[in-house]
């Protein structure tokens, strides 16, 4: 029987792009730990806040940080495959964005982070619109949202 392949689908390891790795050295250290723990692939998911940064600027910054991370892994002999996605903070504007730039690379899966304590207006309509466009929202940190854990049916409306 072959060993299972571990994949980290939600990490903040790109250098200097959000609250994860502060620089290239931190990225290398964290990816070495991932590799030592048996992780063979990662999906870099830096935070995207529509209200703070335009989508194109975000995509360019992520691409630059990704390039630095990949080159560092090659230089250091780290054998962890890496792709990009994003952890997208909920906004009612989501259905109007080019979501392909935010999805897990090569997929239609989009990682969405909801506000922690406030049930956002329009959540049902926004998630439904995303689904109608052919994308599948994946909720990050669902355990943090009392309005979801207390009423899971909310997500099925």
Residue ranges and their predicted role:
Residues 1-78, 156:
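An N-terminally biased module of ancient metal coordination in phosphate/nucleic-acid-related enzymes
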Residues 53-157:
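Extended substrate/RNA-proximal surfaces in nucleic-acid metabolism proteins
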């Amino acid at each position: 029987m072959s060993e299972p392949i571990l994949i980290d689908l939600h990490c903040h390891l790109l250098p200097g792009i959000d609250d994860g790795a502060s620089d290239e050295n931190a990225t290398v250290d964290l990816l070495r730990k991932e590799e030592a723990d048996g992780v063979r692939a990662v999906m870099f998911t830096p935070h995207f806040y529509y209200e703070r940064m335009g989508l194109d600027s975000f995509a360019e910054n992520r691409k630059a940080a990704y390039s630095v991370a990949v080159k560092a892994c090659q230089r250091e002999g780290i054998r962890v495959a890496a792709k990009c996605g994003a952890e997208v903070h909920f906004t009612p504007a989501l259905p109007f964005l080019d979501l392909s730039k935010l999805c897990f690379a090569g997929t239609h899966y989009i990682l969405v982070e909801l506000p922690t304590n406030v049930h956002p207006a329009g959540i049902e309509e926004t998630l439904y619109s995303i689904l109608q466009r052919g994308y599948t929202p994946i909720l990050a940190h669902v355990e943090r949202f009392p309005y979801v854990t207390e009423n899971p049916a909310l997500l099925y409306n």
